[in-house]
Amino acid sequence: MIRHARPTDAPTLARLQTYLREPSPGLLDAALDADAYSPATVLVATADDDRPVGYLLAVPGDGTTYVAELVVDPDHRREGIATALLSACAARSERLTVTVAPDDEAARSLYRRCGFEEARRLPDFFADGAAILYRR
């Protein structure tokens, strides 16, 4: 099931965030803080017991929504969870963009399967190198 994140999900999402190459803890914290103004949205994929097993952090921008973070628990990968999160995000936004490390073939393959196309290369985007910008 896909739902909006709740503040009570924060510990589980923080654990999931550790699987990301370059996490943004401040952005996730702000998106989950009901008292903070943040345009970011966090969608959560849950197991049968409503425990988060993946999430997508989306930030709306000028005519597009940027997928800032997408992560699935390693024990639940290859179950269609990332695809479901992207589909739920796409249902709320006409255009999506995402940046991916060139050597992250699993992520690049996922985004291509979900209809994203490579828009351009961004040198020195990540702390450890370049990124590819994908659009859908």
Q: What kind of region is each of these model predictions?
A:
Residues L85, D104-A107:
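Conserved short alpha-helix immediately C-terminal to the canonical SAM/SAH-binding motif I
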Residues R6-P7, T97, A101-E105, C114, ...:
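C-terminal "cap" of GNAT-fold acetyltransferases
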Residues A88, S109-L110:
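Structural preference for long, well-ordered alpha-helical segments within the folded cores
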Residues G80, G115:
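Short glycine-rich hinge loops at helix-strand junctions in the catalytic core
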Residues H4-R77, T83-S87:
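Acetyl-CoA-dependent GNAT
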Residues A84-L96:
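Conserved acyl-CoA
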